[in-house]
């Protein structure tokens, strides 16, 4: 009997293949999804809402060759083990595989095998317990993809009509954008308040430490209490007089307590991503890439962690016993009195997954240094430490708060804490809390009641002027936490949300902080006003709960799709009717400064809002914060950097992919490609030249006169012939056919190809086989 096992990734296939080759089981990989909705042919009918939500599929173009090879392998086998990932998406991929294979092999038997870790024991156990496909999970995944498709397909074109083309809306991305935009608006609306912090330095036993003002008369003083300058000056003067008169601090009260800090549960997807952001500074997608490699077993030996898309912190009984025994052996004083099992706080924790843990706790990070490298090692170390720490005792701190009287009118306070028992901190140091303030604990000497301490002068009384700060921008960790708290998204989608928003141009990420672009704010405002229910956090959370009910068989998938589709389609039709005949531009009250005849119009462009004169003869355009034709805005010039082409000053500008610098004489080009200014030079943000691909100058352009025609290697090492003027009118693809170059410049074709080939080979070691002939041909 011939048997085939299908997993998702080649590396996993290689690893599992080593376990099963003696059994005659061939293992191959689907390389992810094998089919997708046929949007090109069926458009909005790819999921036909008027015909029972019938879906029309096509082989995924990027995976077509591999899928056809896989189908040929399955043509004559007796049994196929569907061993894709143990979640809804994996179940759906298995169903698509089964549907395709059945067309080629009607007598084939299909068995579903699931496993949470990749090692021989787990794989053989999964085969022994093979089941049928879970169609409830398949339907739940179809509902998710169906709603995502319908929402995106019908809502996105409305954005095109209302704002500009190329924008998109999404069932999950739009509520996430709302979260970020609301924070952005909080920051913009924030008005800082000035306050003063008053402290003094004192000492005992040669240990100096600061104490903070905590009482004036009978009034308590908090960190931000003193906001009146006259009040501050009055009491600052009195305090300085007391210091000058040798007034001493008298210990009034010493409060001590034991504070314990418990270990956190083993990782789930969201907490792993949060810690990776805090501790390693990684993006969510980088974290998931490293986790995928650890799960599959990059060395080809076995997987190193359990499945990494989970919202359950549960340890299997076998793993719980193993981790606890390891801790008892290696950390006998720090291990808990008994094994600790954790449970999910979420009622919607998906499927029967475990937490993210090492497949074998005895494989310490140190022992795997030669096997795991770079990101994989760092993430494995974090997972290993967190898993072991979850079975250890709490850390114990002695916390001390000392109150000092400074005359009868003032009190000061000092806080300190000392770690007296490490507990789980033996193996795991927690990352900084999200956007948390730093602890103000200080090292304190041994102090007793009624002790008298003198101020250290200088500095004496220290008064610091400070300002309240706006709410911090989200990073990927804090965004994931908020989405999880709201019940938006699932473990499989957390990493993709920031990436999707960034790719759409709705957000930028700088130093791990997320800023919403003007475009993102505009899109959010439109969706929030026209689709309020669909970006409502509770609605999105309820939708996730319903999908969980479909997955568990408690709700019919068609019923759920109908519940979504009816009201949504009605709203879409209403909005389209409202927008009919409306312009994307809005008239402002600002008169055109160039012609003085018309009010400027405002609309959204690729880089955000811009204003323009409606008179086509005027051609006035204004991009806020940039140089524009007709007037000047405030611009930032680079110091000591001049344009190497014309000697002009270099201006820092904002582009779609970040900041860059440009010559002040570079005004861009008109639609016909003609220059608006006298220069075309652009560079990096610091003024250094861009890393341009190697290019071979062929000759002067016959259309532009002042530009060169050149060959450059960009795509698969195939040279492309272009004009320096990107808007070259001779070819709409911006690429110029070889024949046209030969005819226009009167040069030999064979000689041209030979010279270009030798140039790239000799100068850059690029082996080029042929020139890109023009827009109708495709490079090999």
Ranges and model annotations:
Residues 14-41, 174-221, 323, 328, ...:
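Structured, non-catalytic alpha/beta "coupling" segments that mediate domain-domain communication
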């Amino acid at each position: 009997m011939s048997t085939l096992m299908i997993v998702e990734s080649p590396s996993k296939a290689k690893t599992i293949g080593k376990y099963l080759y003696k059994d005659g089981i061939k293992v191959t990989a689907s390389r992810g999804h094998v089919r997708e909705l046929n949007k090109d042919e069926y458009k909005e009918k790819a999921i036909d809402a008027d015909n029972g939500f019938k879906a029309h599929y096509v082989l995924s173009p990027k995976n077509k060759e591999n899928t056809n090879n896989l189908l040929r392998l399955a043509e004559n086998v007796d049994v196929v083990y569907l061993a894709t990932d143990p979640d809804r998406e994996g179940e759906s991929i298995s169903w698509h595989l089964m549907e395709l294979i059945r067309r080629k092999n009607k007598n084939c038997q299909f068995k579903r095998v699931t496993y949470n870790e990749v090692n021989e024991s787990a794989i053989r156990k999964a085969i022994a317990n093979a089941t049928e496909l879970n169609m409830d999970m398949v339907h739940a995944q179809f509902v998710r993809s169906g709603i995502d498709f319908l929402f995106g397909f019908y809502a996105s074109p409305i954005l095109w009509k209302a704002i500009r083309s190329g924008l998109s809306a999404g069932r999950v991305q739009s509520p996430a954008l709302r979260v970020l935009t609301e924070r952005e608006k909080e920051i913009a609306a924030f008005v800082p308040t000035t306050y003063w912090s008053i402290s003094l330095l004192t000492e005992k036993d040669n240990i100096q430490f600061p104490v903070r003002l905590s009482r004036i008369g009978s009034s308590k003083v908090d960190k931000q209490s003193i906001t009146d300058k006259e009040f501050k000056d009055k009491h600052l003067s009195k305090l300085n007089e007391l210091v000058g008169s040798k007034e001493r601090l008298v210990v009034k009260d010493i409060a001590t307590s034991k504070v314990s800090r418990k270990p956190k549960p083993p990782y789930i997807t969201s907490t792993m991503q949060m810690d990776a952001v805090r501790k390693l500074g990684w993006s969510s997608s980088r974290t998931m890439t490293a986790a995928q490699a650890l799960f599959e077993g990059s060395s080809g030996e076995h997987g190193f962690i359990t499945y990494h898309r989970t919202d359950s912190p549960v340890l299997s009984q076998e793993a719980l016993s193993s981790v606890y025994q390891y801790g008892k052996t290696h950390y006998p004083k720090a291990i808990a009195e008994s094994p600790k099992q954790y449970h999910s706080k979420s009622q919607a924790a998906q499927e029967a997954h475990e937490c993210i843990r090492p497949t074998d706790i005895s494989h310490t990070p140190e022992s795997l240094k030669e096997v795991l490298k770079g990101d994989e090692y760092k993430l494995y170390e974090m997972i290993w430490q967190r898993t072991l720490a979850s079975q250890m005792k709490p850390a114990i701190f002695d916390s001390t708060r000392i109150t000092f009287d400074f005359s009868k009118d003032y009190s000061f306070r000092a806080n300190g804490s000392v770690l007296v028992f490490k507990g789980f901190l033996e193996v795991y140091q927690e990352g900084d809390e999200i956007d948390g303030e730093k602890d103000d604990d200080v090292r304190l000497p041994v102090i007793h009641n009624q002790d008298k301490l003198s101020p250290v002068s200088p500095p004496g009384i220290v008064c610091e002027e400070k300002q309240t700060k706006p709410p911090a921008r989200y990073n990927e960790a804090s965004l994931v936490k908020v989405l999880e708290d709201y019940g938006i998204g699932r473990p499989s989608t957390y990493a993709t949300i920031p990436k999707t928003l960034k790719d759409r141009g709705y957000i930028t990420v700088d130093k791990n902080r997320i800023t919403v672009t003007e475009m993102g704010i505009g899109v959010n405002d439109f969706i929030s006003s026209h689709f309020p229910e669909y970006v409502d956090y509770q609605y999105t959370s309820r939708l996730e709960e319903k999908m969980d009910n479909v997955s568990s068989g408690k709700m019919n998938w068609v019923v759920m799709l109908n519940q979504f589709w009816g009201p949504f389609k009605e709203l879409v039709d209403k909005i389209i009717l409202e927008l009919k005949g409306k312009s994307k531009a809005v008239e402002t009250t600002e008169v055109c400064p160039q012609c003085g005849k018309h009010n400027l119009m405002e609309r959204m462009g690729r880089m955000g809002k811009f204003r323009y004169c409606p008179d086509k003869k005027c051609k006035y355009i204004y991009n806020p914060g940039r140089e524009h034709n007709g007037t000047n805005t405030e611009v930032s010039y680079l110091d000591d950097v001049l344009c190497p082409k014309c000697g002009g000053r270099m201006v820092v500008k904002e582009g779609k992919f970040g900041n860059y610098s440009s010559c002040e004489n570079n005004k861009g080009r008109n639609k016909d490609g003609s220059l608006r200014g006298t220069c075309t030079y652009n560079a990096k943000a610091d003024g250094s030249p861009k890393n341009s691909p190697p290019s071979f100058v062929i000759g002067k352009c016959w259309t532009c006169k002042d530009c060169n025609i050149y060959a450059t290697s960009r795509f698969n090492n195939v040279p492309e012939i272009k004009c320096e003027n990107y808007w070259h009118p001779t070819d709409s693809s911006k690429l110029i056919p070889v024949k046209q170059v030969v005819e226009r410049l009167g040069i030999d074709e064979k000689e041209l190809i030979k010279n270009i080939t030798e140039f790239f080979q000799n100068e850059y070691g690029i082996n080029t086989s042929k020139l890109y002939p023009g827009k109708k041909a495709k490079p090999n």
